[in-house]
Amino acid sequence: MLILAGLGNPEPKYEKNRHNVGFMAVDALARKWGTAPWRARFQGLACEGQVSTPDGPVKLLLLKPKTYYNESGRAVGEAMKFFKLQPTDVIVFHDEIDMAPGRFRMKSGGGAAGNNGIRSVTSQVGDAFRRGRIGVGHPGHKDAVMHYVLGDFHKVEHQWLDPILDAIADALPFAAVGDDERYQAEVMRLAPAPKADPRKPAKDD
């Protein structure tokens, strides 16, 4: 079994924020692989699912914590303990400001790199869980980061956002059998990152 958790904030006003791209990824995964409706569980909204792999079906728990971004670990830890899973059975999808828009990287272990949601998960389950990092770009100055991540994606950003969310769902069978490197490569093959940040106008030659 795998827990696929997204980082985000639960209120409707945050729904389209860059900080909620983890929730968006889990929603895409649920549309593709979910087998039951969302319901309140584990201090969040949870949905059961199943993904087909060459090694047979793998059960899924899709999870959107309602604890707010910075306390996401409480929900993830509760679900992991309930199902008696290991941290390596958990993938947490989240926004990554230190990656260009539309990039996707899998990572296992390591520090939180200033991400309070990841720090919260680490405090509950240790640092061996897997992370699906979705690049949203950086506003250019650290004082602008909070306003930036709590801002909605611009219309032009959906040129890369919508395809990468679909790819994260479509390529999941590779992650379900533990091949995170192949999963990452397949997501980027299905949804290549833009060559330039679509938020910024192209410079004249």
UniProtKB/Swiss-Prot annotation:
It is found in: Cytoplasm. The record marks N9 as: Discriminates between blocked and unblocked aminoacyl-tRNA. Gene3D superfamilies: Peptidyl-tRNA hydrolase (3.40.50.1470). GO terms for cellular component: cytoplasm. TRNA binds at Y14, Y68, N70, N116. It catalyses: an N-acyl-L-alpha-aminoacyl-tRNA + H2O = an N-acyl-L-amino acid + a tRNA + H(+). Keywords: Cytoplasm, Hydrolase, RNA-binding, tRNA-binding. The active site is at H19 (proton acceptor). The keyword Ion transport does not apply. The record marks D95 as: Stabilizes the basic form of H active site to accept a proton. Its main location: cytoplasm. Coiled coil: none annotated. It holds the Pfam family Pept_tRNA_hydro. Its EC number is 3.1.1.29. One of its GO terms (molecular function) is tRNA binding. GO terms for biological process: protein quality control for misfolded or incompletely synthesized proteins; rescue of stalled ribosome. Hydrolyzes ribosome-free peptidyl-tRNAs (with 1 or more amino acids incorporated), which drop off the ribosome during protein synthesis, or as a result of ribosome stalling. HAMAP family: Pept_tRNA_hydro_bact. NCBIfam families: pth (TIGR00447). Monomer. Belongs to the PTH family. This is Peptidyl-tRNA hydrolase. It comes from Caulobacter vibrioides (strain NA1000 / CB15N).
